[in-house]
Amino acid sequence: MESLFIFAFGMMLSSASALSCIPCVPEECEDPGPCEYGKVLDPCQCCLICRKGPGEICGGPWNLQGVCAEGFACITLSGNPVMNLNGGGQEVGRCRKKY
């Protein structure tokens, strides 16, 4: 019984940090218009959104704050790259030129 409780609690924790996406209907996506730094699919992998440019906010959970343009990296205020593993890091950063 205790193992069932631990399993259920673990499932609650994992679902609390999951990204919920509605079913994708590409026809309902808004056109982002011209994007100076290119386009990328949104965090739900459905609609196109503009990539972020130099100095713009990026990262966060599932990269909800945006993805940097090609040749740029999302760098935290502490100077570390935002980790992008299984849904992105929790930290927000700014787009900086890769060297």
Swiss-Prot record:
- Intrachain disulfide bonds: C21-C44, C24-C46, C29-C47, C35-C50, C58-C74, C68-C95
Task: Write out the transmembrane intervals.
Answer: none
Source species: Cupiennius salei
Instruction: Answer whether the UniProt record assigns the keyword Nuclease to this protein.
Output: no
Extract the PANTHER family matched here. CYSTEINE-RICH MOTOR NEURON 1 PROTEIN-LIKE, INSULIN-LIKE GROWTH FACTOR BINDING PROTEIN-RELATED
Question: In which tissues does this protein get expressed?
Answer: Expressed in hemocytes.
A molecular function GO annotation:
insulin-like growth factor binding
- Glycosylation is annotated at S20
The primary location reported for this protein is secreted
Leftover remarks: Does not reveal bactericidal activities against E.coli and S.aureus.
According to the lineage, what is the superkingdom?
Answer: Eukaryota
A single Gene Ontology CC term: extracellular region
Keyword Plastid among UniProt keywords: no
- What's the name of the protein? Single insulin-like growth factor-binding domain protein-2
Keywords recorded for this protein, A-Z? Disulfide bond, Glycoprotein, Immunity, Innate immunity, Secreted, Signal
| Protein purpose | Has a role in the innate immune system.
Q: Which residues form the IGFBP N-terminal domain?
A: 19-98
SUPFAM superfamilies with a match to the protein in the record: Growth factor receptor domain
Q: Where found?
A: Secreted
Q: Which GO terms describe its biological process?
A: innate immune response; regulation of cell growth; regulation of signal transduction
- Name the InterPro entries for this protein: Growth_fac_rcpt_cys_sf, IGFBP-like, IGFBP_rP_mac25
* Organism taxonomic ancestry: Eukaryota, Metazoa, Ecdysozoa, Arthropoda, Chelicerata
| Signal sequence segment | 1-18
